[in-house]
Amino acid sequence: MAKMQAKVQADERDDGLREKMISVNRVTKVVKGGRILGFAALTVVGDGDGRVGMGKGKAKEVPVAVQKAMEQARRNMFKVPLKNGTLQHEVHGKHGASTVLLAPAKDGTGVIAGGPMRAVFDVMGVQNVVAKSHGSTNPYNLVRATLDGLRKQSTPGDIAAKRGKSVEEILG
């Protein structure tokens, strides 16, 4: 089972969504008559304004696998509350053996994140963020852990509603 790590490819479609292909793996299924080759693609899609989604597609040909992954990513999009091009607060995300730490950063810092995490932030439209991964560096697990962390983001309005206070009281 040879593994092909594809270069992250960016594409912007007519619907205004940014697409990035994170990886393409060649997979084999061994059967009585020999081997059957296939491909698995991992992609992320975002609108550059806080919406992001991840998709995984499998097929006998690379373009078909990528197409399936992009369609699935579009269906799985969700909104992340951003604050001035960065995150609301520091947060941890976990999936499988991958753990990620995501922290907001000051203007001018840029996206300090490795591989698959960088692709997620690029399609989301985050300009300043610091991210660190621990554990497994499997691209699928890293993307899922990053999305887990992003789902845990809460706005000051959310926290105020939970505590039964006003936003001004929360922000001090």
Curated annotation (Swiss-Prot):
HAMAP family: Ribosomal_uS5_B (MF_01307_B)
Family: Belongs to the universal ribosomal protein uS5 family.
One Pfam family recorded for the sequence: Ribosomal_S5_C
Organism: Burkholderia thailandensis (strain ATCC 700388 / DSM 13276 / CCUG 48851 / CIP 106301 / E264)
Gene name tied to this protein: rpsE
Described function: With S4 and S12 plays an important role in translational accuracy. Located at the back of the 30S subunit body where it stabilizes the conformation of the head with respect to the body.
Recorded superkingdom: Bacteria
Positions of the S5 DRBM domain: 17-80
Free-text comment about domains: The N-terminal domain interacts with the head of the 30S subunit; the C-terminal domain interacts with the body and contacts protein S4. The interaction surface between S4 and S5 is involved in control of translational fidelity.
Protein name: Small ribosomal subunit protein uS5
Gene Ontology MF term list: rRNA binding; structural constituent of ribosome
